[in-house]
């Protein structure tokens, strides 16, 4: 990435002096003094957590009193609210019920109710295949999941060669799964078109969102992006679509040598391979654990270099091509083709999450600088677009 190595907090200030040609011309918003992410839990949320655990888990959970249940917020979610629910030590287990679970409450539902049903089915299938946490309960507002002793990876750990290779292998195995969902790759542009229409239909009070749409000519730009990707070969596989550090758990008590687990499948679908890899590379830049407004940091210089991308690609292809014998020339061509594929689909990642964040700004109750983040993603889009020498002649 063509940027200096200093940390950039947030994106440019919406409505300020902007340039869509790169990040360096953008003005970052002034941090809001002493504004930190809240970790408090409302009494109503505590009560509802108790009711769901009691009803869906049964056993010892029915014997514990509401005030005895430990409900602690889990940081890291930008789409949902997460809580760790635990039984008190003095309440004995009665059977095979878990003693602690993860409660996921849906945030602003942008995908539609049908997508939530499909996600729950997907979650259950992956759990049965030991590829994800167990599912303990599903209800309209969210679900109860297995709490895994683990921690999410940190943004800077994505650059670690050993971890990067392991993530590539994990992604390749995910891509090789057969799932009972439509194989037509409509998810990417279908979702972006819906997001854009929802943004355009926002009330007139949502002026900052309208400014972003007009500033970047997003409708026309989406058509340009579609033309580029239509001319970019990329296999359709079952994609996670959100492999960022917060969705990769480092297990404390793994059942095998494989100590990484992918979680959060709400955006998973059959999609183009290039999007999943390009999206992961974009996430090398963003740290969502920043504790002050806008609650993320962007470091453009951390976008993976050519060599870092090749390391990932080689581990990915090694898993996909198990048993195949390729000449050195064939292998090199595959690597070069994949570099081009990824660089183009990385644009789609910026565009997708830029639209997503613009819409979240008008709906979400999660403390996060959604508009600042949207602007950062769109600026990255235009910067990386300008670096694609073959953009106009794919």
From Swiss-Prot:
EC number in record: 2.7.1.32, 2.7.1.82
Pathway: Phospholipid metabolism; phosphatidylethanolamine biosynthesis; phosphatidylethanolamine from ethanolamine: step 1/3
Residues involved in substrate binding: 77-79
Molecular function via GO: ATP binding; choline kinase activity; ethanolamine kinase activity
Keyword annotations from UniProtKB, A to Z: Acetylation, ATP-binding, Kinase, Lipid biosynthesis, Lipid metabolism, Nucleotide-binding, Phospholipid biosynthesis, Phospholipid metabolism, Transferase
Swiss-Prot/TrEMBL catalytic activity: choline + ATP = phosphocholine + ADP + H(+); ethanolamine + ATP = phosphoethanolamine + ADP + H(+)
Function: Has a key role in phospholipid metabolism, and catalyzes the first step of phosphatidylethanolamine and phosphatidylcholine biosynthesis.
Protein name: Choline/ethanolamine kinase
Organism: Rattus norvegicus
């Amino acid at each position: 990435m063509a940027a200096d190595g200093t940390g950039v907090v947030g994106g440019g200030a919406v409505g300020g002096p902007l340039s869509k040609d790169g990040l360096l011309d953008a003005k970052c918003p002034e941090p809001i003094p002493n504004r930190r992410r809240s970790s408090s839990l409302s009494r109503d949320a505590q009560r509802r957590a108790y009711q769901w655990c009691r009803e869906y888990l049964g056993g010892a959970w029915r014997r514990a009193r509401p005030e005895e249940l430990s409900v602690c917020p889990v940081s890291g979610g930008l789409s949902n609210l997460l809580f760790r629910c635990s039984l008190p030590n003095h309440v004995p287990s009665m059977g095979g019920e878990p003693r602690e679970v993860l409660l996921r409450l849906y945030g602003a539902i942008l995908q539609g109710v049908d997508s939530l049903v499909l996600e729950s089915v997907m979650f259950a299938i992956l759990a049965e295949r030991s590829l994800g946490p167990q599912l303990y309960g599903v209800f309209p507002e969210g679900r109860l999941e297995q709490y895994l002793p683990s921690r999410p990876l940190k943004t800077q750990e994505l650059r670690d060669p050993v971890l990067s290779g392991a993530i590539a292998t994990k992604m390749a195995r995910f891509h090789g799964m057969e799932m009972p969902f439509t194989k037509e790759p409509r998810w990417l542009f279908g979702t972006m078109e819906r997001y854009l229409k929802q943004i355009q239909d926002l009330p007139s009070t949502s002026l900052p969102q309208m400014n972003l749409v007009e500033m970047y000519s997003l409708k026309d730009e989406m058509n340009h992006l579609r033309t580029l990707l239509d001319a970019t070969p990329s296999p359709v596989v079952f994609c996670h679509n959100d492999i960022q550090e917060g969705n990769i758990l480092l297990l404390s008590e793994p059942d095998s040598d494989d100590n990484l687990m992918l979680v959060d499948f709400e955006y998973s679908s059959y999609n183009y391979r290039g999007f999943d890899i390009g999206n992961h590379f974009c996430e090398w830049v963003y740290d969502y654990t920043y504790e002050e407004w806008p609650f993320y940091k962007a470091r453009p210089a951390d976008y993976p270099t050519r060599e870092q991308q090749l390391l990932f690609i080689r581990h990915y292809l090694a898993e996909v091509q198990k048993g195949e014998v390729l000449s050195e020339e064939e292998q090199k061509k595959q690597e070069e083709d994949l570099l081009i594929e990824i660089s183009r689909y990385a644009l789609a990642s910026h565009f997708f999450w830029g639209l997503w964040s613009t819409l979240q700004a008008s709906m979400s109750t999660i403390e996060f600088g959604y508009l600042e983040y949207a602007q950062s993603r769109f600026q990255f889009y235009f910067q990386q677009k300008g670096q694609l020498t073959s953009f106009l002649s794919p």
